[in-house]
């Protein structure tokens, strides 16, 4: 399937399963924001910083693991535009699926933030409300937006690389729970990055709280960094580290009209290759 071919997008729109998948992404992302950001806004970071970081890291990591487990059979359990981008650039989903996944993920994030806003006390609403921002001290930035992009790209790379590894159907060594491995990737990334950027690694997660309280300072960082990390991780794993990675797979991904990322035979039929400049 050539992911930018209108035919593949129309085929998606005609399937009832596709619309179920959109609903699953909406619910999964809403729950992620409500639980993850809820753990952040109901904590007191100044009292015990280490306990705060651990609490929030566990909340996000375990929620991701739970929701991926719950909806992976319906939508793939992306609940993150950066994950969806990784699947787009490796031609595993169509363009319309990517765009609507992101739209429903972002809508779900705003809905989750709205539910959190409606169910918490006023002092929480006057605070940062789980928004992401660069680390500061005495009103001065400790890291620059460029450093923020780098941090977010790295931790999102860890997440998406793990997602692709757990979804590699041709690996014979996979054991244990894939959703748990993905949740652990989120957890360990939060342990590192909460003191630096608040840890986004998910543009939708950053968008929800920002919409509710109107906080947009450096918000673009939490789109650029995660999307960059997600795209690089998806391409690198699929083309270099997957069980069936090869130069032939890379070539077919680049030029074949009906590329199948999970095909057993990687030989390219030259009659169906349509090279693009």
Curated annotation (Swiss-Prot):
Motif (NPA 2): 202-204
Motif interval(s): NPA 1: 80-82
Chief location: membrane
Residue stretches spanning the membrane: 21-41, 56-76, 98-118, 145-165, 178-198, 221-241
GO molecular function ontology, one term from the record: water channel activity
Domain of life: Eukaryota
Protein name: Aquaporin-5
Organism name: Milnesium tardigradum (Water bear)
Origin organism lineage: Eukaryota, Metazoa, Ecdysozoa, Tardigrada, Eutardigrada
Annotated gene: AQP5
């Amino acid at each position: 399937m050539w992911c930018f071919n209108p035919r593949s997008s129309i085929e998606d729109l005609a399937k009832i399963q596709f619309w179920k998948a959109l609903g699953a992404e909406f619910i999964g992302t809403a729950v992620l924001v409500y639980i993850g950001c809820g753990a952040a806004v109901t904590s007191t970071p100044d009292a015990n910083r280490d306990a705060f970081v651990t609490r929030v890291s566990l909340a996000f990591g375990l929620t991701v693991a739970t929701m991926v487990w719950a909806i992976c059979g319906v939508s793939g359990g992306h609940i993150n535009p950066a994950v969806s981008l990784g699947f787009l650039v490796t031609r595993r989903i169509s363009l319309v699926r990517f765009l609507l996944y992101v739209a429903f993920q972002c809508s779900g994030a705003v809905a989750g933030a709205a539910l959190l806003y409606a169910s918490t006390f006023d002092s929480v609403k006057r605070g940062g409300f789980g928004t992401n921002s660069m680390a500061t001290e005495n009103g001065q930035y400790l890291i620059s937006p460029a450093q923020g992009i780098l941090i977010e790209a790295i931790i999102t790379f860890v997440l998406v690389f793990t997602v692709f590894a757990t979804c590699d159907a041709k690996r014979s060594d996979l054991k244990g729970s894939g959703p748990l491995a993905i949740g652990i990737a989120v957890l360990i990334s939060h342990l590192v990055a909460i003191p630096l950027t608040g840890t986004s690694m998910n543009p939708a997660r950053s968008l929800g709280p920002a919409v509710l309280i109107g906080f947009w300072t450096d918000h673009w960082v939490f789109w650029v960094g995660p999307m960059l990390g997600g795209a690089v991780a998806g391409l690198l794993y699929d083309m270099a580290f997957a069980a069936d990675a090869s130069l032939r797979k890379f070539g077919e991904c680049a030029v074949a009209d009906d590329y199948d990322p999970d095909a057993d035979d990687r030989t390219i039929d030259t009659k169906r290759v349509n090279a693009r400049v």
